[in-house]
Amino acid sequence: MVRTSIKSIGSGIDRLSALPEHLLCRILSELSTKDSVRTSVLSKHWRNLWLHVPVLELETSDFPDNLVFREFIDRFVGFDKEIDLKSFDIFYDVNVLWYDDFLWMIDDVVKRRVCDLMVTNNPYVVNEKLVKMPISLYSCATLVNLNLSFVAMNNLPSESVCLPRVKTLYLHGVKLDGDSILGTLVSSCSVLEDLTVVTHPGDYEKVVCFRSQSVKSFTIESQCEYKDPNVEIDCPRLEYMCIREYQSESFVVHSIGPYAKVDVDIFFEVEYEDPLAISMIRNFLTGISKVREMTISSRTLEVIRGYHSMVKALPQFSNLSSLDALLVESYWELLPVFLGCCINLNSLVVELDGLSEIEEFKVSPLLQDSLSARGFVQQKTPVSVTKTSSERKIAAYFVKKSG
């Protein structure tokens, strides 16, 4: 049997072309668009086969000019409009692709009932050249995954925005030319589960409200040098929330899942003597106090330290079982205070960042009992930092208490 197959292959029989067309298209969909198009020269049978593939991945730099690019898109999109487009992924340079052609292209992709859409612009273009997404995109009934980078969005009436099947929404450096675009967009995605927003420094929005009954994962990351928009979160089913390098005057957590995991790196540009600032920080800490797992940055610990210095109290984190904290020397004394609010903690990872000599590390009796009775404690020191004798004492203390 094996010898027969080898002989048949060696005799030049084209067994691949004998496969059903839907299988061949499935094979081609696993290739890059470049390689898929190259198969058109194999034989007459393969000449137009790539046009039936419901996946397209392009870069405008692959084409000599805008006209050639448009001709290619025209041929692909117009070849068989009955075929649903599974995925369309384009990396374009606004300096090459004309604006009208871009709008036309996205419109046609939407008409082909696209499922996954990824649009990435050259990240180095100035704000004035960011291409605005066409209105048709905001009411695409077939879209499931939407990934946009370095484009712009106009403010639209809420009744004109409806994305009923979108489950994943990723916005990286998307400039929002309005004051309620994100909130409207998220609210229009009734089955949205995964939301990621990397802010744009030129946004007009001052307050962003994320309200969703379906979102399970939410990440927000700053690209601003100074102040980010204020945020409100109302996502009762949220299982994971990540806040990276964020800096704002307010971040309100109205609701998240009762046993969520959070990764918090946020700093508030406030005066701790201001009663409104103290109230806002209290509400933020209370909003995340029901989580089960937490990773917290030194910047956020600085906020907690400033808050504690004014009110001498912290909310109880009674559900918290796992904590990963990045500490610098000046915040070390806060650790026992914070952990004293975590009565059910059984896993503690302490990352030491540039600690110098300290005479003594004091831990509250409550923390001592917790460490000796539950879980484990792990110490991490950056590779570039040499452990001081005090750090070795701290590590020895943790080992002793967790043994």
Swiss-Prot record:
Gene3D superfamilies in the cross-refs: 1.20.1280.50, Ribonuclease Inhibitor (3.80.10.10)
PROSITE patterns: FBOX (PS50181)
UniProt xrefs under InterPro entries: F-box-like_dom_sf (IPR036047), F-box_AtFBL13-like (IPR053781), F-box_dom (IPR001810), FBL13/AtMIF1-like (IPR050232), LRR_dom_sf (IPR032675), LRR_FXL15/At3g58940/PEG3-like (IPR055411)
Domain F-box as annotated: residue spans: 13-59
Pfam families from the UniProt entry: F-box, LRR_At5g56370
CDD domains linked: F-box_AtFBL13-like (cd22160)
Name this polypeptide is given: F-box protein At1g60400
Organism field: Arabidopsis thaliana
